[in-house]
Regions:
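Conserved glycine-rich "GG(E/T)P / GGGxP" loop and the immediately following alpha-helix
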Residues: 111-136, 153-157, 226-230
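Conserved C-terminal portion of the radical SAM core fold
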Residues: 137, 170-181, 200-243
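Glycine-rich anion/phosphate-binding loops
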Residues: 85-98, 123-125, 158-160, 200-201, ...
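Conserved, mostly hydrophobic/aromatic
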Residues: 20, 44, 74, 113, ...
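Flexible, acidic/Gly-rich N-terminal and inter-domain linker regions that tether
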Residues: 1-63, 67-71
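Generic structural signal for well-ordered alpha-helices
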Residues: 100, 126-131, 162-165, 203-206, ...
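Conserved radical SAM core fold
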Residues: 83, 112, 117-120, 147-154, ...
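N-terminal pre-triad scaffold of radical SAM enzymes
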Residues: 39-83, 88-114
Length: 243
């Protein structure tokens, strides 16, 4: 090995990476705690090159936020507001299509659609939004609705989650974003977003989407109340879902 780690605790992890062995939660904690940033970068690049060669990919997307009105009040959220807030808004479908028309002038390849859980907008609003965008921009991929939104839309539609996902997919949904995962640890979620669905439900929504051929992203909100161990646990749970 030509690279020399400043932190000798990374040497056992390097051996695992070299022999394609799976890292443990404890390894994840070590990687979070080490000050050897170049060492972590070296390890990550070994895996990146093995999986993707020397290729890097980007997409050109545009965010569409139909509304910022939300029934929840998550402690960390600066987006969602109540209906009587002076900055509250809800866009008509015509406004959304008009916005998309402006965006698409720049060779956009994806519309990323997320918003608040509006107390009054019907399921048909979201369905017609997907259909309208797909008719107008058939070449643009639509990634829309976090797991929290999808669970809420299923309630609006009065359908099981699988049927809701299929209905949305038929209307033009291509994949789902990873928002709302925050940190899966119950201790933390109870304090920062107790009204949201629990981590296990977030994972089950994504599992259902994968079962229907929909791909998804995943996020992690960190740097607040969580421990390093809870960060590592979050990543392990995502990896288990990916399995």
């Amino acid at each position: 090995m030509l690279f020399e780690f400043e932190d000798e605790n990374l040497n056992p992890i390097y051996e695992k990476v070299r022999f394609h062995e799976r890292l443990s939660l404890e390894d994840g904690v070590t990687l979070w705690k080490t000050q050897d940033l170049l060492g972590v970068g070296y390890l990550a690049n070994q895996v990146r090159e093995r999986m993707n060669g020397d290729k890097t990919y980007f997409i050109h997307n545009r965010h569409i936020n139909p509304t910022n009105i939300c029934i929840h009040s998550c402690q960390f959220c600066a987006f969602g507001v109540k209906e009587d807030h002076p900055h509250a808004y809800e866009k008509s479908l015509d406004e959304i299509f008009s916005d998309a028309e402006k965006y698409n002038g720049g060779d956009v390849s994806e519309f990323h659609i997320v918003g608040g859980l509006h107390p009054d907008l019907p399921f048909e609003y979201y369905l017609d939004m997907l259909k309208g965008l797909k008719v107008r921009f058939p070449e643009v991929h639509i990634q829309a609705f976090t797991a929290i939104e999808l669970e809420y839309l299923a309630k609006l539609a009065k359908l099981p989650l699988d049927e809701t996902l299929l209905t949305l997919k038929d209307a033009g949904l291509g994949s789902i974003p990873g928002g709302g995962a925050e940190i899966f640890a119950k201790r933390v979620r109870k304090k920062i977003c107790g009204e949201k669905l629990i981590g296990e439900h977030w994972l089950s929504v994504h599992e259902a989407a994968h079962g229907l051929g929909l791909k998804s992203n995943a996020t992690m909100l960190y740097g607040h109340l969580e421990t390093v161990e809870e960060r590592a646990d979050h990543l392990v749970r995502l990896r288990e879902l990916q399995d």
